[in-house]
Amino acid sequence: MRTLTILTAVLLVALQAKAEPLQAEDEPLQAKAYEADAQEQRGANDQDFAVSFAEDASSSLRALGSTRAFTCHCRRSCYSTEYSYGTCTVMGINHRFCCL
């Protein structure tokens, strides 16, 4: 029984390792398509939007004395080095708000 559990865990890790590079390769293609759509619609509805951080994220960084700024993007899914700080809406579609 223990051997079956270990083999299953190894199989799941191998599948996950194989799936992550596919997602990383697909991300630039999605970004290019998104940029093309955004450029087409930029002339039709030129709108500004504000980004604000929840108090817990920014105040905790200030309390630690960090001088590093957040770099955030609105994406379908966050990279492994990013954290999701909520959601954002672009052209009526909800995405994750991913920050480094």
From Swiss-Prot:
Q: Which UniProt keywords apply?
A: Antibiotic, Antimicrobial, Cytoplasmic vesicle, Defensin, Disulfide bond, Fungicide, Immunity, Innate immunity, Secreted, Signal
Q: Where in the cell is it found?
A: Secreted; Cytoplasmic vesicle, Secretory vesicle
Disulfide bonds, paired cysteine numbers: C72-C99, C74-C88, C78-C98
Tell me the superkingdom of the source: Eukaryota
Q: Which Pfam families match?
A: Defensin_1 (PF00323), Defensin_propep (PF00879)
What GO terms describe the biological role, i.e. biological process, of this protein? antibacterial humoral response; antimicrobial humoral immune response mediated by antimicrobial peptide; cellular response to lipopolysaccharide; defense response to fungus; defense response to Gram-negative bacterium; defense response to Gram-positive bacterium; disruption of plasma membrane integrity in another organism; innate immune response in mucosa
Description of post-translational modifications = Proteolytically cleaved by trypsin at Arg-68; the propeptide is stored in the tissue of the small intestine and the mature peptide is found in the luminal fluid; cleavage may occur during or after release into the lumen. The N-terminal propeptide region suppresses self-assembly and renders DEFA6 propeptide unable to agglutinate bacteria and protect human epithelial cells from bacterial invasion.
**What are the boundaries of the signal sequence?**
1-19
Record's GO cellular component terms: extracellular space; Golgi lumen; transport vesicle
Name one molecular function that GO assigns to this entry: protein homodimerization activity
SMART domains (UniProt xref): Defensin_propep (SM01418), DEFSN (SM00048)
- Primary site of residence: secreted
Q: Which residues form a coiled coil?
A: none
Q: Any chance you could tell me the propeptide residue ranges?
A: 20-68
Its family? Belongs to the alpha-defensin family.
- What does the subunit section of this Swiss-Prot or TrEMBL entry state? Homodimer. Self-assembles into higher-order oligomers termed nanonets, fibril-like structures that entrap microbes. Self-assembly into nanonets seems to protect against proteolytic digestion in duodenal fluid. Interacts with Y.enterocolitica invasin and S.typhimurium fliC/flagellim; the interaction creates an anchoring site for progressive DEFA6 self-assembly into nanonets.
PANTHER family listed in its UniProt record: ALPHA-DEFENSIN 1, DEFENSIN-6
The protein's role, per its UniProt record: Host-defense peptide that contributes to intestinal innate immunity and mediates homeostasis at mucosal surfaces by forming higher-order oligomers that capture bacteria and prevent microbial invasion of the epithelium. After binding to bacterial surface proteins, undergoes ordered self-assembly to form fibril-like nanonets that surround and entangle bacteria and thereby prevent bacterial invasion across the epithelial barrier.
The name this protein goes by in its record? Defensin-6
User: Taxonomically, what lineage is the organism?
Assistant: Eukaryota, Metazoa, Chordata, Craniata, Vertebrata
